[in-house]
Swiss-Prot record:
Protein name in the entry: Fibrillarin-like rRNA/tRNA 2'-O-methyltransferase
This protein's UniProt keywords: Methyltransferase, RNA-binding, rRNA processing, Transferase, tRNA processing
UniProt source species: Haloquadratum walsbyi (strain DSM 16790 / HBSQ001)
HAMAP family reported in the protein's UniProt record: RNA_methyltransf_FlpA (MF_00351)
Annotated family: Belongs to the methyltransferase superfamily. Fibrillarin family.
SUPFAM superfamilies on file: S-adenosyl-L-methionine-dependent methyltransferases
Function summary: Involved in pre-rRNA and tRNA processing. Utilizes the methyl donor S-adenosyl-L-methionine to catalyze the site-specific 2'-hydroxyl methylation of ribose moieties in rRNA and tRNA. Site specificity is provided by a guide RNA that base pairs with the substrate. Methylation occurs at a characteristic distance from the sequence involved in base pairing with the guide RNA.
Gene name of the record: flpA
Record GO terms (molecular function): histone H2AQ104 methyltransferase activity; RNA binding; rRNA methyltransferase activity
Location of region: Disordered: 1-29
This enzyme's EC code(s): 2.1.1.-
TM region positions: none
Binding site for S-adenosyl-L-methionine: T76, T77, E92, F93, D117, A118, D138, V139, A140, T141
Pfam families given in the database record: Fibrillarin
Length: 215
C-alpha cells in the first residue's frame, strides 16, 4: 500500500468519527461534515476520484495543476478537485446541475463551470486553455473512450488522463471486464495506459484508468 504522501498537496487524511478520512479544505457542498479547521470530508462512496485516493491508486496529481473535468454533475467531486488544483474547467451538459456548479464556484474562483457536451469539445475549445495538465473524465454515456480521444487535444504532451469507466453505461448485458477491455483497446488509439484498477470496493462495475497521450 502506498503511503499518504502520494496524495496531492491540499488533500489530507484527517480524523472524522475516530476514523482516518480523506479531506480537502473548503466550503461544504453536498452536506459533508467539516471540522473546525475548515477541512471537509471527501466521501469515496460518492466520488470515483476519491475512491482512487482511498485505494492508493497513483494518479501523479501533486496539487496546483490545470484540470479539464468532464462530467462535473452538481460538483460533488469537482469541488474537491478545485480545492487543491489550479484552473479547473468543469464540463456538464445538463442545465440543472450547472446551476449548482455555479453556486459551488462562488467560493472557488478557480472553478469554471461550462454548460457543454463533453462529446463535442469544439463547443468549448474557445474557452478551455491548451496544454492542460490533467483531463479527468467521469461521464455516464456510451462511447467513453471516444470522449477521451476527442478531448485529448487539450492535454499537454506530458499531461495525464484519469478516466472512470462505467461498464453499465456502455453495455448493460455484457460482462464488465469484457466492456473494460473493449474500451481500453479503443483508448490505446490515442493513449498509453499506465494504470487500470477496478473500484468495486466503493463503486460496482467501475474501472479507473490513468494514461498519457500517445503523441
Amino acid at each position: 500500500m502506498k503511503a499518504s504522501s502520494s496524495l496531492p498537496d491540499g488533500v489530507q487524511r484527517r480524523q472524522f468519527d475516530n476514523r482516518s478520512r480523506l479531506t480537502t479544505h473548503g466550503t461544504t457542498v453536498y452536506g459533508e461534515p467539516r471540522d473546525t479547521d475548515g477541512w471537509r470530508l471527501w466521501d469515496a462512496g460518492r466520488s470515483k476520484l476519491g475512491a482512487m485516493f482511498k485505494l492508493d491508486i497513483e494518479t501523479g496529481l501533486t496539487g496546483g495543476e490545470s484540470i479539464l473535468y468532464l462530467g462535473a454533475a452538481s460538483g460533488t467531486t469537482v469541488s474537491h478537485v478545485a480545492d487543491f488544483a489550479g484552473p479547473t474547467y468543469a464540463i456538464e451538459f445538463a442545465p440543472r446541475p450547472v446551476r449548482d456548479l455555479l453556486e459551488v464556484a462562488t467560493t472557488r474562483p478557480n472553478l469554471i463551470p461550462l454548460l457543454c457536451d463533453a462529446r463535442q469539445p469544439e463547443t468549448y475549445a474557445h474557452v478551455v486553455e491548451t496544454d492542460i495538465e490533467y483531463l479527468i473524465q467521469d461521464v455516464a454515456t456510451r462511447g467513453q473512450a471516444t470522449v477521451a480521444l476527442r478531448n485529448r487535444q487539450f492535454l499537454a504532451p506530458d499531461g495525464k488522463l484519469i478516466l472512470m469507466i462505467k461498464a453499465r453505461s456502455e453495455d448493460v448485458l455484457s460482462d464488465p471486464e469484457d466492456v473494460f477491455d473493449t474500451i481500453i483497446s479503443t483508448l490505446r488509439e490515442g493513449y498509453i495506459i499506465q494504470t487500470r484498477q477496478r473500484l468495486d470496493r466503493f463503486h460496482d462495475d467501475h474501472l479507473a484508468v490513468v494514461a498519457t497521450p500517445n503523441m
